[in-house]
Every structure is written in structure tokens, then in C-alpha cells.
């Protein structure tokens, strides 16, 4: 069973302290033989956040080859399983743009936003709307689809 993230976890993982914690967790093997020692180290340094850190790093590793920029994503096991492969999402976005130039696309089950990321990168898509019943997944989705100050 995978870890269930909270909105508080998302806020921590995107904070300066959380980003440093993710760097630390990423430097650990997080394999079956090392897991007890790795958990102990993370718990000693980031008590209360160790499970979220381990889930994020192990999911990032599994997402390589499936999701663009996997090394920077916040993912749960369930979200990773349900996320559309970036190549497939890119092809779908291109097809929507070709068939419906200037479209505003609504992904009603956007989860962590894998398809929305590709839609926002595709010329000819006028806008995207994402919705989901899970507030944690929406919080994660907003990280990847909201314009940043430098955009």
C-alpha cells in the first residue's frame, strides 16, 4: 500500500526545507537491503516527513521514461500508475490542437496534471482547465500547470 499524501505534505515538499530533504532522500539507495537504515536516517533528520520523502523519491525513480521531468515531480504510487505517459499526452495534445485550433481543453480528471502539462506546452491550445475530486492531486497539479513568475 502506498503512502497517502496530504496538502500539508505537498506544502512541505515544495518548501526550501522540503526541497533539501528531497535532495537528501534522493541520495539514499532506498532499496530493500538499505531501507531500514534509510528510513532511520530520514526519520532522524525529517521526522514526520520520512514516508512522504520516500514515496516521492521512489515514485520519481519509477517515473523516469514515463513522465517528462520525473526527477522534479511530486507523485504517489497511485498517481504514477494513473498518469498518462508524456509521449502519449504530447501526441494527444498535438491532435487536439490540429483538429480544434484555439481550443480550451478541460481535463475533468486531471490528477497530478500529466496531460495538462503537455497541453500547456502545445501551440494552438488557447487554455487548459483541470479538475479533480482529490484536493491533494489538485495541489500537485497546480505546481506544474500554473504560470511561474518568470513565464
Where are these regions (language model features)?
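Conserved SAM-binding motif I beta-strand of class I
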Residues: 127-132
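Conserved SAM-binding loop
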Residues: 141
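S-adenosyl-L-methionine
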Residues: 2-100
Amino acid at each position: 500500500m502506498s503512502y497517502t499524501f496530504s496538502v500539508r505534505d505537498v506544502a512541505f515538499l515544495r518548501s526550501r526545507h522540503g526541497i533539501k530533504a528531497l535532495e537528501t532522500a534522493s541520495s539514499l539507495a532506498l532499496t530493500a537491503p538499505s531501507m531500514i537504515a534509510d528510513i532511520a536516517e530520514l526519520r532522524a533528520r525529517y521526522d514526520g516527513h520520512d514516508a512522504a520523502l520516500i514515496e516521492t523519491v521512489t515514485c520519481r525513480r519509477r517515473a523516469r521514461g514515463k513522465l517528462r521531468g520525473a526527477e522534479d515531480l511530486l507523485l504517489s504510487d497511485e498517481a504514477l500508475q494513473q498518469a498518462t505517459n508524456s509521449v502519449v499526452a504530447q501526441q494527444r495534445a498535438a491532435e487536439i490542437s490540429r483538429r480544434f485550433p484555439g481550443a480550451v481543453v478541460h481535463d475533468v480528471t486531471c490528477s497530478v496534471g500529466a496531460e495538462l502539462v503537455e497541453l500547456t506546452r502545445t501551440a494552438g491550445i488557447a487554455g487548459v482547465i483541470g479538475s479533480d475530486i482529490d484536493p491533494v492531486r489538485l495541489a500537485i497539479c497546480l505546481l506544474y500547470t500554473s504560470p511561474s513568475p518568470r513565464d
